[in-house]
Regions:
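Amphipathic, small/basic residue-rich leader segments at the start of a protein or domain
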Residues: 1-137, 147, 153-157, 161-164, ...
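Alpha-helix capping/hinge segments and adjacent helical runs
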Residues: 18-20, 29-34, 67, 96, ...
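Glycine-rich beta->alpha junctions and the first turn(s) of the following alpha-helix
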Residues: 19-20, 46-50, 56-57, 239-341, ...
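C-terminal helix-coil-helix/basic helical segment that borders enzyme active sites and/or dimer interfaces
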Residues: 73-80, 338-386, 399-400, 501, ...
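N-terminal glycine-rich flavin-associated loop
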Residues: 131-153, 179-182, 191-194
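A short, Trp-centered hydrophobic/proline-enriched beta-strand micro-motif
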Residues: 165-173
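Short Gly/Pro-enriched turn/cap motifs at secondary-structure boundaries
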Residues: 177-180, 206-209, 221, 246-253
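A short core secondary-structure module
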Residues: 196-240
Length: 570
């Protein structure tokens, strides 16, 4: 850590950080506190804490995915059969799987955010990422803008149909010249002379659910201000383009949208002119989380396929599952799955706690709910990045176990390999999500929101006297490894601020590697906290795999922290 003499560093004094007066954030529920809290010091939500109702929700969705969707995953669900898709979506509506964030008075089931995570994992046992996409869009970016920012009339008009599955939802953000820089939208809306319509002109690309959707939340500029509006299928001047021919996700709909003097009623505007960031980015924030969470079931399914194949495949007179190299791949797959599982439920547990403290009778309740999830943008980006990259690594291992058969379409790995690649691109590329994570944590550190000033003082002590987490137990070495990574992050951030000051936000390589350290720290923290919390249960059930997963992940990935630090400092 740098001394107070550093001009642009994090100056630690009684008045705050870098001259900012600090509020008392100690009792506020917000994201990012994992950095300054010791591993295991707070209770984390995990599968072992599922209520009976949550267990029922999990089994219901998993049963639907396994019994209704999985038999169709290698064939029918890859044909873009709109009639079949609508039938299955309506079935999900009847089961209450579409209105998870929607109040009952608008036709929804309004589950907790933990329920949302449970369903996101459960549906991914279907073996069809294409159909998972239909559900993900329907329940996040295609509807959350209306739930959180729509008025009562808008909610009454569109949400019941979305919840029942009668209407399919979509979201139009990306443009030919505005991808990750979404606020650079060239699509415009101009108020008509009679004041009754916005005349919309522009184009959107890569729109999931696009060919089938009935309602579209569309981002655009009105009077130069980023806004969001709902456009209905069939509106004059609104045309849906041809399906894109894609490398993977063959069963999902992906089309461009065209607006040519499209007359959209002014009452379709979500919020006010200039409020577009809320509907667009709050929905994306949850969509990112769900993308990561929905990888869990798919990873479990991939492992199941690989284990069954390895047991049945004979080579050199024995099952290949007996070979150490195959066992290593399966062990790595188990570690990836358990750590992602732990991370997802830890993240959503914190958000659920924060949302539960909101006043449901507050007229701004749903806007505040969206704003609350934004406080966890770093953690949600971590879930998206780690989930997509963990799934990619696991699929590669399982593909390799299949050998040449992995390359054959009638076996499950070829489709999984192709379909997963997009997950590192949509919902914001992994590079963009690392930027979001890194910048969000810097903001929280400088604001005093996560107690970073006080934490730096502890790091000073660590550097002089050695690290002592205060934890005593079988996992002491692993806990202190993760705590050391947090300290390394603090040192690297302080050094970077000293060198670059306010310009640090433009130093992408530095931000990316700071984010890499945070990803390791949060995944390690979540996994170790879960194992420590459930130690007695695991001993009782003679379950040794969770602790082994935590130990191996901490050791193997911890080595990389110094590589990231060297890139930052050098």
């Amino acid at each position: 850590p740098q001394s107070n003499s550093k001009k642009n560093g994090v100056v630690k004094n009684g008045n705050g950080v870098n001259g900012h007066v600090l509020m008392d954030f100690s009792k506020i529920k917000t994201g990012g506190k994992f950095l300054t809290n010791v591993v295991g010091s707070e209770k984390v939500f995990c599968k072992e804490l599922f209520s009976e109702e949550e267990k029922m929700i999990y089994e219901a969705m998993k049963d639907f995915a396994t019994n209704e969707l999985l038999p169709l995953s290698q064939n029918e669900l890859n044909k873009k059969d709109e009639k079949l898709i609508r039938k299955l979506v309506e079935q999900m509506g009847e089961l209450g799987f579409l209105g998870i964030d929607v109040p009952e008075k608008y036709g929804g089931s309004e589950m907790t955010k933990t329920g949302m995570c449970i369903l996101a994992e459960g549906i991914s046992f279907c073996g069809s990422p294409s159909f998972c996409t239909v559900w993900n869009v329907q329940t996040s970016i295609g509807s959350l803008g209306i739930i959180w920012y729509g008025n009562d009339e808008q909610k009454k008009k569109w949400l019941p149909g979305i919840c029942s599955g009668e209407k399919i939802a979509a979201f139009g953000l990306t443009e030919p010249e505005a991808g990750s820089d979404a606020t650079n939208s060239k699509t415009t809306g101009v108020l008509s002379d009679d004041g009754k319509h916005y005349i919309v002109n522009g184009q959107k690309i890569f729109i999931s659910n696009g060919a089938w959707a009935d309602t579209f939340i569309v981002a655009l500029k009105i009077d130069g201000k980023f806004s969001s509006i709902v456009v209905e299928k069939g509106t004059p001047g609104f045309d849906i383009g041809k399906e894109e021919k894609k490398m993977g996700m063959e069963g999902s709909s992906t089309v461009p949208l065209y607006f040519t003097d499209c007359k959209v009623p002014v009452e379709n505007l979500l919020g006010k002119v200039g409020d577009g960031a809320g509907p667009a980015f709050c929905g994306l924030n949850i969509g990112r989380f769900k993308l990561g969470a929905s990888a869990i079931g798919g990873m479990m399914l991939g492992m199941q396929h690989a284990v069954e194949y390895a047991k049945s495949r004979k080579a050199f007179g024995q099952s290949i599952s007996d070979f150490g190299s195959i066992q290593d791949k399966l062990a790595t797959s188990a570690i990836l799955t358990y750590t992602l599982d732990s991370t997802c439920y830890s993240v959503i547990g914190k958000q659920t706690e924060a949302i539960n403290e909101l006043d449901k009778d507050d007229p701004e309740y749903y806007v505040k709910q969206g704003n609350t999830t934004e406080q966890y943008i770093a953690e949600n980006s971590i879930v998206k990045v780690y989930g997509s990259e963990a799934a990619e690594e696991l699929i590669d291992h399982c593909f390799q176990i299949y050998g040449g058969y992995g390359f054959i379409e009638e076996y499950p790995m070829a489709q999984a390999y192709r379909d997963n690649r997009i997950n590192k691109i949509w919902e914001g590329t992994n590079e963009i999500n690392r930027m979001l994570c890194g910048r969000a944590m810097i903001t929280k550190a400088l604001s005093g929101e996560i107690g970073f000033k006080e934490y730096l003082e502890k790091v000073d002590v660590y550097c002089n006297n050695g690290l002592d987490s205060g934890y005593e137990g079988d996992l002491k070495t692993e806990v202190e490894c993760v705590e050391a990574a947090k300290a390394v992050y603090a040192i690297c951030l302080n050094e970077s601020l000293s060198k670059h000051g306010q310009d640090i936000g433009t130093e992408q390589v530095i931000i990316e590697n700071l984010a890499n350290i945070l990803i390791y720290a949060y995944v390690g923290d979540s996994t170790l906290s879960r194992v420590i919390q459930n130690k007695d249960l695991y001993v009782q059930k003679n379950q040794v795999v969770p602790e082994l997963c935590a130990k191996v992940y901490t050791a193997e990935q911890g080595i990389r922290v110094m590589e990231y630090a060297n890139k930052i400092l050098n």
